[in-house]
C-alpha cells in the first residue's frame, strides 16, 4: 500500500486530478482516494485528457462516451499509454476485471479518424512508418497499382482482407508493417499462421537483420530451452509478431499465452490451404476460425478480430472458398487486393519436340 501511495504522489498533479475525477464514486477506489486526499474536477475532463495526452492519442476519439461508459477502464488505458516501454502489457487481473481496456486503447491509439489529426497523420500513416521501421521511401507497386500500400493501410484501418501477390512480391512486409505499428501503439500481438517452419525462421531472421527483434516463432523445430524462452517473450510482451503453424492453435500452452495478450490480427499465409480445391489443402487451417471464435468469447471482445489472408496465386473457386469460410465462421467480409499472376522478371515458353534427341 505504501508503494502505491508513493507511486500516486509521484504523478504530476494534473494526472492525479484526472485519474481521481474518472474514478470518483467507484466503490473499489473510494478508500484509496480518500487516503491520499485526492482532488477532483467535475467539468472539462475530456479537455484535460486531450491536453495531457496530446500526440499520444487521436484528438477526435469519442472521449465523452468512454468517460460515461468506461471510466475505470479508461483510467487503466491512459495509465498504460503513459508507459514509455511499448512492450509493457496490461496485467491479467486488470483485463479480467476490466476487459474493455484493450478496446479503449485501440479506440484511442489505433483507430484512424476521418479528420486526420496530428497523431493519426503520423503514427497511423503507413508511409511514415515504412520509413521508420524498414527505411524504405516507397511501397512496391504492381503494374503501377499501389496494392501493397493499400493492403497495409486497410489492415491499419482494421479491415479484413485477402491479398493475392506473386511470390517475392512483398507480401510479408504488407502484414509485418501493420503488426509492428500495432505493437508500438496498443501493445498488440499479431499472430501469423504459416504451414512452413523454414519460412517462419527465414522471416524472423530477415527482420532481425533489419534490427527488428520483437518477432518470435514457436514451432516443432525448437529445442526445449529455446521454445521456453520464446514463450516467455510472448508472455512478457516482447513480441509484436508471433509465427506459428495452424496445428499449434490446438496447444493449451499456445492458447494460454495468447489469452494473456491483446491480439490485434490473425495473418494467414498460404491461404489457399483453406480450400479443398487447392493442391495444398490443410485440414488444420479449418480450425483457425473456431480458435478465433473461442478467443473472442473468452476475452469478451467488443469488436471482431480482423484477419489478413495471403497467397501467391489462387483460382476463383479457391478465392471464394476462403471468403466463404471467414463469412460463415466469423462473419467477416474480406476485401480483395489482387495483382496479376505474371512476373516481369520470369519468362517461359513451350517447345514441341519429337524425340529424346531433340530434348
Spans of features found by a protein language model:
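Conserved SF1/SF2 helicase motif Ia
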Residues: 164-169, 174-215, 299-303
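Conserved helix/coil segment N-terminal to the catalytic DExD/H
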Residues: 180, 222-265, 273-279
Amino acid at each position: 500500500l505504501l508503494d502505491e501511495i508513493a507511486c500516486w504522489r509521484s504523478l504530476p498533479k494534473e494526472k492525479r486530478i484526472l485519474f481521481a475525477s474518472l474514478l470518483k464514486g467507484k466503490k473499489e477506489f473510494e478508500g484509496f482516494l480518500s487516503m491520499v486526499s485526492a482532488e477532483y474536477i467535475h467539468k472539462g475532463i475530456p479537455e484535460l485528457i486531450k491536453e495531457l495526452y496530446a500526440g499520444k492519442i487521436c484528438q477526435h476519439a469519442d472521449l465523452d462516451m468512454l468517460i460515461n461508459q468506461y471510466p475505470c477502464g479508461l483510467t487503466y488505458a491512459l495509465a498504460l499509454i503513459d508507459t514509455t516501454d511499448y512492450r509493457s502489457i496490461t496485467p491479467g487481473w486488470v483485463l479480467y476485471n476490466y476487459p474493455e481496456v484493450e478496446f479503449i486503447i485501440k479506440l484511442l491509439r489505433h483507430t484512424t479518424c476521418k479528420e486526420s489529426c496530428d497523431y493519426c497523420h503520423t503514427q497511423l500513416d503507413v508511409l511514415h512508418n515504412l520509413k521508420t521501421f524498414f527505411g524504405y521511401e516507397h511501397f512496391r507497386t504492381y503494374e503501377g497499382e499501389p496494392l501493397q500500400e493499400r493492403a497495409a493501410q486497410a489492415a491499419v484501418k482494421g479491415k479484413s482482407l485477402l491479398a493475392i501477390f506473386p511470390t517475392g512480391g512483398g507480401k510479408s512486409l504488407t502484414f509485418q508493417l501493420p503488426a509492428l505499428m500495432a505493437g508500438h501503439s496498443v501493445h498488440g500481438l499479431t499472430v501469423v499462421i504459416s504451414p512452413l517452419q523454414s519460412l517462419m525462421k527465414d522471416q524472423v531472421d530477415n527482420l532481425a537483420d533489419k534490427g527488428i527483434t520483437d518477432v518470435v516463432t514457436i514451432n516443432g523445430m525448437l529445442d526445449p530451452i529455446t521454445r521456453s524462452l520464446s514463450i516467455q517473450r510472448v508472455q512478457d510482451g516482447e513480441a509484436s509478431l508471433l509465427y506459428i503453424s495452424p496445428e499449434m492453435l490446438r496447444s493449451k500452452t499456445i492458447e494460454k499465452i495468447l489469452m494473456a495478450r491483446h491480439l490485434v490480427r490473425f495473418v494467414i499465409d498460404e491461404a489457399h490451404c483453406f480450400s479443398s480445391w487447392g493442391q495444398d489443402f490443410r485440414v488444420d487451417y479449418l480450425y483457425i476460425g473456431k480458435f478465433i471464435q473461442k478467443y473472442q468469447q473468452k476475452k469478451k471482445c467488443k469488436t471482431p478480430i480482423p484477419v489478413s489472408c495471403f497467397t501467391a496465386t489462387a483460382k476463383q473457386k479457391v478465392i471464394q472458398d476462403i471468403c466463404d469460410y471467414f463469412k460463415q465462421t466469423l462473419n467477416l467480409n474480406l476485401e480483395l487486393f489482387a495483382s496479376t499472376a505474371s512476373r516481369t522478371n520470369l519468362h517461359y515458353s513451350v517447345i514441341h519436340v519429337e524425340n529424346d534427341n531433340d530434348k
